From Swiss-Prot:
Native species: Bacillus anthracis
Protein name: Petrobactin import system permease protein FpuB
Complex and partners: The complex is composed of two ATP-binding proteins (FpuC or FpuD), two transmembrane proteins (FpuB) and a solute-binding protein (FpuA).
Gene: fpuB
InterPro entries, A to Z: ABC_BtuC-like (IPR037294), ABC_transptr_permease_BtuC (IPR000522)
Membrane topology value: Multi-pass membrane protein
Length: 678
């Protein structure tokens, strides 16, 4: 590249970026419910006075715009460093779980250490982010882990920590009031305190990174070359790691977790041609500021009525497609696609008697439902003895038959259906990581159901499954389209699905804010809950559609025994591969969507139950169908019972209980499959 090209590129990146940032800055401070002209804005900037308009601008709008610039730049710089240290082009604070770790620690401190929070909040977020980053790096295989595997581990850790955080928010609703909007990333500032707090930390950390930029360039040559040149690679990595995590911690402390800025901005600069860290850091800082300020402008343009859209949701809507695009590009490189699609995870060399497994499972399912019906929220043993002795009042009978029994049946049937859906997808895609939540169906169905509720609020409740099905089918269609090129690689498919899930979650957050939905109720539904589910839910939403779908899938499920052998062999045996796969995809999506509409988004159930079934009874899909359904029913019934009783009088959504148990299993499964590959 000659000098003229260098000059043109610098003019475009820094001159054009600076001009765009200035334009967005003036648009941003002109937005708001109070109508302030641009002439008044200029007057307030030059010679401010005590008028309401000037004070609104100086104390509310300007701090918000400045913190957007600082936060965007800091997150972009952090993304550059994380991508360099991990040699992972997908690395960023959100994809590595750093945001969720920092946010989890901060919420915990808000609840349990409120007096020390004001002083130590930055310390809590830094420790949480650092621990999470190291954990993700470890679980993904460290230096042997592929970029896709590392990003997938970060996303799953995010889901797990979000489950813990959501549980705490539901338990301590008063203590965490207002954290929902902030937890989604909010730039709202009521004064200059946030800017004054974050500015010195951001500038010092950024200057440190600029100071070691040459050493970071040498790191890209490899440790052997760097050591031969006299560089202390361990010291450089440690300084860069601390600075990157610290930048993220500062931002989470002030404005909450805002994802994908550190992914998009550095990649834009690399696409333009910047590779040296000094210019890469400077340009990424500038364009990270442009991206976040622009996202906040866009969020306020979407709803100019004054209802705050979390800027984190807007950046997720921008960044999720970018993540999918990057994964799609990386599929061209075989080094990222080194995990095969064989669906043997969970297979064992020793299986148990099928009849004994069925008898034990049915017994356990009945016992679990019976316990759920007889035990109240406080789990008194007297409840059981009263049932056995027949000493029940009319109130007790009504409580058991009209409240607890339908709720437990909803949990059992929904658990069975989600497990069957997961089994079908694992068989169709020959992918041990397939699950309605992992491949995007859960969030897609949630968007579809909320769209019906928001756009058509007067429609009867039985239209919810229709909206959920359309949303779920659209989500799985997008995931399958983009992952087809990789041969439905387990890691790539799961990561694209999680990208779709992030996009769906952002849309759901926007729906919640715009529709003024009850935050606690929304959190409960999004976490997955059978709370207040009665006979009408069982009959109209779950039982009839699910029963029909389950019967159809049962008669088709045997086809999976042939499909898992490979398309060529299945075709040679006379199997209509494409028709069978399409039919099962539609049926499994519809089955999952119907139940998600009833009980909310429950993650990992469709992953865990089929794997447990495979361990017990082997690879025969008709046997797996029955066992997966029973295991799913047992798991969600137990989760519902535990959620009602272990923290009385509070109630934990059953979906959170399943997520807390399922996410570690997913990470173990991914770690195990990674060892086989390596």
């Amino acid at each position: 590249m000659n000098n003229l090209q260098h000059t043109l590129r610098a003019s475009l990146v820094f001159g054009g970026g600076g001009a765009l940032l200035l334009l967005l800055f003036f648009i941003h401070i002109g937005q708001g419910q109070a109508n302030i002209s641009y002439s008044m804005i200029i007057d307030a900037l030059i010679s401010p006075n005590q008028s309401l308009e000037h004070q609104t601008l100086i104390m509310l709008r300007l701090p918000r715009a400045v913190i957007a610039i600082l936060a965007g730049g800091a997150l972009a710089a952090s993304g550059v460093i994380l991508q360099t240290l991990t040699k992972n082009p997908l690395a960023e604070s959100s994809t590595m779980g750093i945001h969720s770790g920092a946010y989890f620690f901060l919420v915990a401190a808000t609840i349990f250490l409120p007096k020390g929070l004001q002083i130590n909040s930055l310390l809590f977020t830094f420790i949480g982010g650092a621990i999470t980053a190291l954990f993700v790096y470890r679980i993904s295989g460290e230096k042997k882990g592929t970029p896709l595997r590392m990003a997938l581990a970060g996303m799953v850790v995010t889901l797990m920590l979000s489950a813990f955080t959501g549980t705490m928010q539901l338990f301590y609703e008063n203590e965490t009031a207002g954290l929902f909007l902030w937890g989604a990333g909010s730039l709202i500032q009521n004064n200059w305190d946030g800017v004054q707090f974050s500015f010195p930390f951001i500038i010092i950390s950024f200057l440190v990174l600029l100071g070691i930029s040459r050493k970071l360039n040498i790191l890209l040559l490899g440790d052997d070359v760097a050591v031969s040149l006299g560089e202390k690679t361990a010291v450089t990595r440690l300084i860069a790691f601390i600075a990157a995590i610290f930048l993220t911690a500062v931002i989470v402390t002030v404005v909450g977790p805002i994802g994908f800025v550190g992914l998009v901005a550095p990649h834009l600069m690399r696409l333009i041609g910047y590779r040296q860290h000094f210019t890469l850091l400077l340009s990424s800082f500038l364009w990270g500021a442009v991206l976040l300020l622009g996202a906040d402008v866009a969020g306020r343009l979407i709803d100019p009525t004054g209802a705050e859209l979390p800027v984190g949701a807007v950046t997720a809507m921008i960044g999720s497609p970018w993540l999918i695009y990057l994964v799609y590009r990386m599929m061209k490189s075989k080094q990222y696609m080194n995990d095969n699609g064989a669906n043997t995870a969970g297979a064992s060399s020793r299986y148990y008697s099928y009849k004994k497994v069925i008898i034990i499972s049915i017994t356990l399912c009945i016992v679990t439902i019976a316990l759920g019906v007889t035990i109240g929220s406080n789990a008194y043993i007297e409840s059981i003895t009263n049932v056995i002795s027949g000493q029940l009042t009319q109130f007790d009978k009504n409580m058991m038959m009209n409240l607890r029994l339908p709720r437990m049946l909803v949990a059992a049937i929904a658990g069975a259906c989600l497990a069957i859906s997961g089994l079908v997808f694992q068989g169709i895609l020959r992918n041990p990581l397939a699950d309605p939540s992992i491949i995007g169906i859960s969030s897609g169905a949630g968007v579809g159901a909320l769209t019906i509720m928001y756009v058509f609020p007067t429609l009867p409740g039985f239209f919810l499954p229709i909206g959920a099905f359309i949303g779920g089918l659209l989500a799985v269609g997008i995931v399958l389209f983009f992952s087809w090129k990789s041969g439905f690689s387990p890691t790539a498919l799961a990561l694209i699905g999680i990208g779709i899930s992030a996009l769906g979650s952002a849309i759901i957050q926007i729906f919640i804010v715009k529709a003024n939905l009850n935050v606690a109720a929304a959190l409960t539904w999004l976490s997955g809950s059978t709370y207040a589910r009665g006979w009408n839910h069982l009959e109209n939403i779950i039982l009839y559609p699910s029963l029909i779908l389950v019967l159809i899938i049962f008669f088709l499920i045997k086809q999976l025994d042939v499909l898992v052998l490979g398309d060529d062999l299945a075709t040679g045996l006379g199997q209509p591969v494409n028709k069978t796969r399409l039919a099962l995809i539609v049926l499994a999506t519809l089955l999952a969507s119907v139940n998600i509409a009833a009980v909310g988004t429950i993650a990992f159930l469709g992953l865990v139950a089929p794997h447990l079934a495979r361990i017990v009874v082997g690879m025969n899909h008709q046997r797996l169908f029955v066992c997966s359904a029973l295991f799913g029913a047992i798991l969600l019934s137990i989760a519902d019972l535990l959620g009602r009783t272990i923290a009385y009088p509070k109630e934990i959504p059953s979906g959170l209980v399943v997520a807390v148990l399922g996410a570690p299993y997913f990470l173990w499964l991914m770690r195990k499959s990674g060892k086989k590959v390596n």
